[in-house]
UniProtKB/Swiss-Prot annotation:
Recorded family membership: Belongs to the argininosuccinate synthase family. Type 1 subfamily.
Gene: argG
Amino-acid positions noted as binding L-aspartate in the UniProt annotation, renumbered to this chain: T119, N123, D124
Ranges that cross the membrane: none
GO molecular function: argininosuccinate synthase activity; ATP binding
UniProt binding sites for ATP: A9, Y10, S11, G12, G13, L14, D15, T16, S17, G117
Designated name of the protein: Argininosuccinate synthase
UniProt catalytic activity: L-citrulline + L-aspartate + ATP = 2-(N(omega)-L-arginino)succinate + AMP + diphosphate + H(+)
Length: 397
């Protein structure tokens, strides 16, 4: 009888580490583990490989997808100013790419199942499975943590029983996810929205009170909506994002603490560190204000909001997302220029912006310019708000 193989999306954390053994113990699968490199720390890639080999997987793969993630996902998110309830979608953006890589490998090795470590209350189950079912509908999806209805405490107990080293305990049961675009921290005491996030939860950003005592200026150059240089230095995609993370992070910029609405309908308290994401999106929006017309800006704001909503829900493969990209790409053909930001102890302000495609006209807007005759505006002003004036008259009768 041919052995059953499950390809497991493996991060080395508590959930997926438990899945390594659960797939064997409860489902009778042999496991192939996969870590997809989307910019997480090197140790976060070495650790899964070492753990996987220790626990006897058939094979462990590490797939380098950093460049693809930066160019095909992050840069699209920047052009869309993609923020969901103030969150720049760091985890959400990476999930479809990870799912695609896992599904492709599962097909390649002839796997019977694809597995992930998502719980039944989180968003990632939707993000992974919507893509996996679209790409590999013939392959079963197994989610042991969800399907066995395990709690965090039960997982920790199971891990200890099986001798699985995990980076959490009952005192600090934080769940941390990290990639090129940001870092998320959730769980444990953070589930109480009245509890301040402990300093030790943060790794990318210094506490604003501890940041340097002088302002730092950073200049971002854009070409067709994509960041291409920092302070005049042209950089490749991955290097550029890492550099911006470093600059913003040392100034305490990029911490997000929100209560967000999950796909399932639950509200969840989430902490994020996204210094580079927040800086680049802020800079990009400032450039758009200089270049796009009022009607374009108003409509694009609606498009951007829907775009972020689709990404958050895991609907990267939804045709509407491609349609929105087509509109966004058209607006970005004129998005060429530079933006200067001033960073200081957690604050970020626009200090300057310029573009050869700017609709902003300094001469025309000047109070000293007579090119626009002010007297010609009288008729326009007279009838501005006409319907409201008519309504007001009716209410006085």
């Amino acid at each position: 009888m041919q052995e059953k193989i499950a390809v497991l999306a493996y991060s080395g954390g508590l959930d997926t580490s438990c899945c390594l053994k659960l797939l064997e113990d409860k489902y009778d699968y042999k496991v192939i583990s996969v870590a997809v490199d989307v910019g997480q720390p090197e140790d976060d890639l070495k650790e899964p490989e070492e753990k996987a080999k220790k626990f006897g997987v058939l094979k462990h793969y590490t797939i380098d997808a950093k460049e693809e993630f930066a160019k095909d996902y992050i840069f699209r998110a920047i052009k869309a100013n993609a923020l969901y309830e103030g969150y720049p979608l760091s985890t959400a953006l990476a999930r479809p790419l990870i799912a695609i890589k896992i599904a492709e490998l599962a097909q390649e090795v002839g796997a019977s199942a694809i597995s992930h470590g998502c719980t039944g209350k989180g968003n990632d189950q939707f993000r992974f499975e919507s893509v996996m079912r679209a790409k590999t509908p013939e392959i079963e999806i197994v989610a042991p943590i969800r399907d066995l209805n395990l709690t965090r405490t039960e997982e920790i107990a199971y891990a200890k029983e099986k001798g699985i080293p995990v980076p959490v305990d009952l005192e600090k049961p934080f769940s941390i996810d990290e990639n090129l675009w940001g870092r998320s921290i959730e769980g444990g005491i953070l589930e109480d929205p009245m509890t301040e996030t402990p300093k030790e939860c943060f790794a990318w950003t210094v506490d604003p009170t501890d940041a340097q005592d002088k302002e730092e200026y950073v200049e971002i150059d854009f070409e067709e909506g994509v960041p291409v240089a920092i302070n005049g230095d042209a950089l490749e995609a991955v290097s550029l994002i890492r550099k911006v993370n470093e600059i913003a992070g040392r100034n305490g910029v990029g911490r997000v603490d929100i209560v967000e609405d999950r796909v399932l309908g639950l509200k969840s308290r989430e902490n994020y560190e996204c210094p580079g994401a927040m800086l680049l999106i802020t800079a990009h929006k400032a450039l758009e204000q200089l270049v796009l017309t009022r009607e374009e800006l108003v409509f694009k704001e609606m498009v951007d909001s829907k775009y972020a909503d689709l990404v958050y829900k895991g609907l990267w493969h939804e045709p509407l997302r491609l349609d929105l990209d087509a509109f966004i790409d058209k607006t970005q053909t004129r998005m060429n220029g530079k933006v200067v930001l001033k960073l200081y102890k957690g604050s970020m302000r626009i200090a300057g912006r310029e573009s050869k495609d700017a609709i902003y006209n300094e001469e025309m807007v000047s109070f000293e310019n007579k090119e626009m005759d002010q007297r010609e505006i009288v008729g326009m002003v007279k009838f501005h708000g006409l319907q409201a004036a008519i309504y007001e008259g009716l209410t006085r009768k």
